[in-house]
Regions:
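Flexible, glycine/threonine- and acidic-rich loop/arm segments that mediate assembly and lattice contacts
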Residues: 2-250, 254-327
Length: 327
């Protein structure tokens, strides 16, 4: 049975809504949800660059051939296979902040100096911007403002969609030509990994957007282009709860095992397959995500966080990109 409504508030009752001295109830913690995971940047070893245009040499061997020489042969000098000279351009990535000196000393939620807190946030943002730069198929430019080539520009291995699709040359000088979008298949991944393996690489990391990662999990069902040799079955006892496996985090190919890393900053419609032994991040000295305090222009504090450098694929044929995906 419903309870009857109480009577109206008596006249003259002092209510909270009319009170003058009520304090705010503002939590003393500032919560942050925006992510800062950067799988490709984190996977790179760091080897300093010394010039804005950083260059490196890649040596390949002559192809294997039938080699049977006569006894007592006279030496004939064979052609030398010269190393290939590659380069990339150091890009400046910066985030700045200005805070009044008054704001630095008043009592703020979180109990921190607001200038220092903002610098920490700018550092996270620079790292995210760097992840976007190294995973994007944007081509380097030496004119100011300089821009690095992303790893996809160095990947001649992999595949493009049909139609006008053309892979990058593989030296960072172009991004290729887009083709018709198509659905991802395991056959595409297997082919790209085999191309890298044939050239001497061993991809161990797959970088992809969240949409591609979610679609990858559906490929374990088999079907055209998605041959499934074996499926893992998780055994449970009566004391354990049954777990439905709806994710694919590792893909084992005939040429190695790939850790699948969803990347919030990786461009859509592509998968980058990375041989982590052959990829470097090359910052200029004292320019590797550093904090800077700028000169005061008044009653305020100004500063920023700066990275200057580029990605350096030391053996481009060890990597691959699958472009033009529907996902």
């Amino acid at each position: 049975m419903a309870v009857g409504a109480q009577g109206a508030t008596p006249a003259g009752t002092y209510l909270e809504t009319a009170a003058i001295g009520v304090k705010e109830d503002l939590a003393d913690i500032i919560y942050r949800i925006d992510p800062d995971e950067t799988p490709l940047v984190s996977a790179c070893s760091r080897v300093a660059a010394n010039q804005v245009l950083t260059e490196w040499l890649v040596q390949e061997l002559n192809a294997a051939s039938d080699n049977a020489q006569p006894e007592g042969f006279t030496a004939v000098m064979q052609a030398v296979l010269k190393p290939v000279r590659l380069n990339n351009v150091c890009q400046i990535i910066a985030r700045t902040v200005g805070v009044s000196n008054t704001l630095r000393v008043v009592d703020m939620a979180g109990g921190e100096d607001e200038y220092n807190r903002q610098l920490i946030l700018r550092g996270m943002e620079v790292k995210r911007d760097l992840e976007l730069a190294v995973t994007s198929p944007l081509v380097r430019t030496i004119t100011d403002p300089r821009h690095m080539s992303g790893l996809p520009c160095y990947t001649a291995n992999g595949s493009r969609g049909a139609g006008a699709g053309v892979m990058p040359v593989g030296d960072g000088s172009n991004a290729g030509t887009a083709g018709t979008l198509r659905d991802l298949t395991l056959a595409m991944v297997d082919s790209a990994v085999q191309q890298c393996w044939q050239a001497g690489g061993k991809p161990s990391l797959g970088i992809m957007s969240g949409n591609v990662k979610a679609y990858f999990a559906t490929l374990s069902q088999g079907g055209t282009g998605n041959a499934v040799v074996a499926q893992n079955i998780q055994n449970v006892t009566s004391r354990e709860q049954v777990t439905i496996m709806g994710a694919v985090d590792v893909y084992r190919t005939n040429f190695g095992t790939i850790d699948l890393a969803p990347d919030r900053f990786c461009p859509i419609h592509q998968i980058i397959l990375v041989s982590t032994d052959y990829i470097e991040l090359a910052p200029l000295p004292e320019r590797d995500i550093i904090q800077q305090d700028y000169a005061q222009t008044g009653d305020n504090s100004q500063g920023g966080v700066v990275f200057e450098g580029c990605i350096r694929p030391t053996a481009p044929k060890a990597h691959a990109t699958i472009f033009d995906l529907n996902q």
